[in-house]
Amino acid sequence: MKALQRVAEEFESWGNRTSFLPKSRDLFMLYLAFFFAPLLISQQSRGRSLPVSAFHARSDGMHTMITAHSGCEGRPDNSLEYVQYALHCGADALEVDVHPKDDGFYISHDPSDGAHPDLKDVFSLIRGSGVKVNCDLKHPGIEHAVLTLAQACGVDEQLIFSGSVSLEAIQDPAIRCRTFWNIESAMPALYAQCEAGIPLTEEQIRAAISLYRRCGVQIVNLYYGLCTQERIALLRENGILTSVWTVNDASCARQFLDAGVYNITTRQPVMV
């Protein structure tokens, strides 16, 4: 708009002397906007990334949640700078890694004695934004305490759990309904097997599904390398939705969207 105003100032006197341009400056601005705004927008958009919301739509007409992974787009991991960025990048949710401390919780991928942002400050930033926060719990047994803090901060409706959510905690509907349950929380041996590069068998997948169904799990959180269309479909047939992490490639994201996953976690919530 500033560019159009500058153009208007340059041509205002000339425009007043022509017969084919509007005499009113306001009308002249509209004239310029109509003819030149598309060109300006096109020029300014070159080299910019497209918001990941452009990828939300799936082939079935539904929409997939997009979660900004901690430290997305080059921001410092588990920082308030990252949180503020993630709130305005078009993602539906943002992820932070959560550890307990004597007087609450801090956000950091690894345990630390140093200074780290307080989870309460994260909750204060997201309150009322409509953006959800995925608390990736890095310590067992803190599910209910984090939920209590979220309730006190008025963000419990925005809260999601992933990470170390125990089999015992998942029995509580208040925890279960907001959890993307990691397969390693249910069956730790499977994660170690994957880390070693040993493919999961279909028998193992079906055993995991049986456990999910017994526990009433609604959404599972899987490493994207484990997710095939067949497995996503098998989970769906059993009433279980799929969240995948961490997808940083647009073409890969499109494949998961077309497969109908519930959530994609990515370090690139703005994809080129």
Predicted regions span which residues?
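Phosphate-group recognition and catalysis centered on beta-loop-alpha active-site segments
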Residues: 3-272
